[in-house]
Amino acid sequence: MTRVLEPAEPILSNDGTPYSPRYDDVYHSARGGLAQAHHVFLGGNGLPEGWAGREQFVIVETGFGQGLNFLATWQAWRSDPQRCRRLHFVSIEKHPFTREGLARLHAHAGLGDLLPLSDQLQQQWPDALPGLHRLSFEDGAVTLTLALGDVETMLPKLVLGADAFYLDGFSPSRNAEMWSDTVFRGLARLARIGATLATYTAAGFVRRGLTAAGFEAHKAPGFGGKRDMTVARFAPVWKNRRHAPPEAAQWAERHAIVIGAGLAGCAVTERLAARGWRVTLLDAHDGPARQTSCHRAAAMHAHVSADDSFLSRLSRAGNLHALRAWGALEAAGYPVGWHGTGVLQIGEDDAENAAQQAALAELRFPESFVRWMSPQEATEQHGATVPRGGLWFPKGGWVAPPDICRAQLAKAGAAVDALFNCRVAAIRRIGDAWQALADDGGVLAAAPVLVLANAYEADRLTSGQFLALRRVRGQLTDLAPAQAEALGGWPDCVVTGGGYLLPRDAAGGARMGSSYEADEGPLVERPEVHAANLDRLASMLPDRASQIAQIDPATLQGYVGVRTVTYNRLPLVGRIADDAQALSRAAALRGAHLRDLPRLPGLYAALAYASRGLTWAALCAELIASQIEGEPLPLEADLADAIDPARLLLRALRHGHAQAPESAGPGVDAAG
């Protein structure tokens, strides 16, 4: 993974064409970037005719540049009455412009009717952070997925089936890595049969490389004074891929059951409804967000580590995606009540502080995402009298999770049939439909797709053998307004360290936490845990320690709940494996990859978000909806694998620890 992204500079050549001093080349012909986009890329791929009447159409681009190809394609889609239902545009860019740089170039480009589209793009434009960034337009009908990083790094990380390719890197003589055989093979891995390709270059080695990768390539009339360009079609004469790329799903009925109406389930419900699905939402409680998601206030921020671990990457991607998703809800008239106060994460000791600073130096992320904040600045700017400095996340903050759930269900509207006070006792698959059963065996709902978003209760409904869900108890502590006032001041931002504290609410009260312990005994508040939370508070605000010591833990109230976690703290998201079938073929699958494992058709998990439900729910819901529809995934392949529900099964198979079961296991009846 490319960790440090160096943004491009918005420089113009003598004739006014955007120019890159890094590659000593222009971004497009002097005769105009939009005209080039229409002739070379739209025309060269037979668009818009090629997407007519399609459910979805996927374009992959190498070299986003200033985004003129995307804007021209988006405009062509909007103008076409025969347009595809959903347009996915996936573009790889190693040196993205900043938002300000993009705005300067677009102002110079004379975009005319495209200016409103440019404004929307600029509003959602991400920071220069490595990984995938999914931007949504036209109420989700047009999706731009930016893959920020080196092309040879990012291509293998894309999970999608492409219908068309735009090859728009700088000239092969200036940027050879964009035109390598490795890249051509990477394109072929993603291409659906018959996928088209176009590029402005007519270099012979490009056509030969494409041909070797399975494309039929030939010359076509060029643009802007160039006699020729290259067009191609993917038509391999032999099987050259272990796994074919995903195809657009063909569902006879777009109806899904979602079990669980917390952050995970409501997010999945909204994402499916946005794609035209009808959703039956089942929950054992009397409304949404009644269990672990019922907090009246919870914080969200990214995780940073020098090695940019799976946890760090997933948290960064989830944090950014959640903010965009919630912004879209707000813009559509469904307020979520986000408080962007910022989050200060201090180290618990000097060693952790040093590790935080080392991570910043290694990653060199934009300060708009994370930077160092000294204790002096924390005190002066935010009233946070912390003992040491820490990581400042300016886009972090807090929100009430139930408000998120209510906004998502309101957005889903009539597409969702929510059944509360409705306990699911078992699930089974009969024919092509999953059924959710009541305690008396009656069918509560039936649909071709079922999503388990019910935390540790999922163990009851599946064999559970390789989900390995664990319950971890957590207790929060509330301070009454008078108690918070007696401390003589309170930070106006979220502070995390050995524990965490949230800004005071509208009534003047405050919240802090949280314990993290094995789930044992009755689920009731314990004074000794409130006392431990007070100790955590004193460690973060040591100058208030004497006042904090005056608070009697026995007088405190709060909230106690159970987190669902896995062995490595990463969630379980995606298609659930068919354990019985896999174990019956254990010897044959010992050297398998995740994509080789048999899956239970139509059964998905959105589980084990632990204490990061706010961070992960929106992104993981988009992942599940994309898998169901056969769309490009919003996560890199290795990240999707890292949270795959079948990962523990795969590990058992590889180590020879998997044994064939005596039965299909409790919970899932796959009869029929």
Swiss-Prot record:
Gene3D superfamilies given in the database record: D-Amino Acid Oxidase, subunit A, domain 2 (3.30.9.10), FAD/NAD(P)-binding domain (3.50.50.60), Vaccinia Virus protein VP39 (3.40.50.150)
Top-level taxon of the source organism: Bacteria
EC numbers on record: 2.1.1.61, 1.5.-.-
Provenance organism: Cupriavidus metallidurans (strain ATCC 43123 / DSM 2839 / NBRC 102507 / CH34) (Ralstonia metallidurans)
Protein's name according to its UniProt entry: tRNA 5-methylaminomethyl-2-thiouridine biosynthesis bifunctional protein MnmC
Catalytic activity: 5-aminomethyl-2-thiouridine(34) in tRNA + S-adenosyl-L-methionine = 5-methylaminomethyl-2-thiouridine(34) in tRNA + S-adenosyl-L-homocysteine + H(+)
Names of required cofactors: FAD
Function: Catalyzes the last two steps in the biosynthesis of 5-methylaminomethyl-2-thiouridine (mnm(5)s(2)U) at the wobble position (U34) in tRNA. Catalyzes the FAD-dependent demodification of cmnm(5)s(2)U34 to nm(5)s(2)U34, followed by the transfer of a methyl group from S-adenosyl-L-methionine to nm(5)s(2)U34, to form mnm(5)s(2)U34.
Keyword Glycoprotein on entry: no
Chain intervals for the UniProt region annotation (FAD-dependent cmnm(5)s(2)U34 oxidoreductase): 259-672
InterPro entries the UniProt entry points to: FAD-dep_OxRdtase, FAD/NAD-bd_sf, MnmC-like_methylTransf, SAM-dependent_MTases_sf, tRNA_MAMT_biosynth_bifunc_MnmC, tRNA_MNMC2, tRNA_S-uridine_synth_MnmC_C
